[in-house]
Amino acid sequence: MLLEVNDLSISYGKGNPVVHGVSFSVDKGKILAIIGESGSGKTTVLRAVGHILPRQGQVTGGHILFEGKESETKTIREKTSFIFQDSGAMLNPIRTIGTEFSEYLAAHGITGGEAEDCMTNLLSQVRLPDPAGILKSYPFELSGGMRQRVGIAMAMAIHPELILADEPTSALDVTNQAVVVREMMDVCARADTAIIVVTHNMALASYMADTILVMKDGNAVEYGSAEKVIYHPKDPYTKLLLAAVPDPGGVLS
């Protein structure tokens, strides 16, 4: 198993835990969706896995195992990539995509002609037209969907074993949501990469995930295969989320 989270509890400052005893796992080539409303603790869990909790946040119980060993910041940074809600917000508006991308690659030891080939190939893989033109563009010259696909391409560049995605489609229109979701699923299948995606959208989770974890008030209220959670939910909260999606299995098809 690539990642195992066992009985995880997280607190901010000296307050009571905001996440209580959450457990889940995800293996290579699989997608786990963590779903819940704002304040449910789903993003906090993702940050703990990625070792990017805010300074006042701390894991107060449980274990995070990566490749069977206690998770360490150095290992996670080397083998994990992040996709945020708006990848464009992470890009410098006065620098071209090519400049940003090449500096990112250089930080991971990829330079020169190898970097040029890598950037072009990755932008092509996420189906961006005219990769050479994209590399010469500034972030504000691209649509939200195109910026997000650039973010996915950059996330793929270091051949991560795990991608952590926090609401990667919530700022996009329906058409661009579908494109970005399919690109993430392609990455998972093509590179045997594990993905954990945080979302409030049950329809999105049901479409792309192999496994779903439902969170409410810092607790895991339901966890299992996507089919089991979608078609045979046990918790009333899960049923409430599903009631808002008439045909979750048909979304984006």
Regions found by a protein language model. Give the residues of each.
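ABC ATPase "signature
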Residues: 220-224
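Q-loop/switch helix immediately C-terminal to the Walker
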Residues: 86, 95-106
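A short, proline-enriched helix->beta-strand linker immediately N-terminal to the Walker B motif
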Residues: 157-161
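The feature captures the beta-strand-to-loop junction immediately N-terminal to the Walker
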Residues: 35-37
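A short, surface-exposed alpha-helical micro-motif characterized by mixed small hydrophobic
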Residues: 205-207
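ABC ATPase NBD coupling module
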Residues: 58, 69-81, 99, 107, ...
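Conserved ABC ATPase signature
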Residues: 137-142, 146
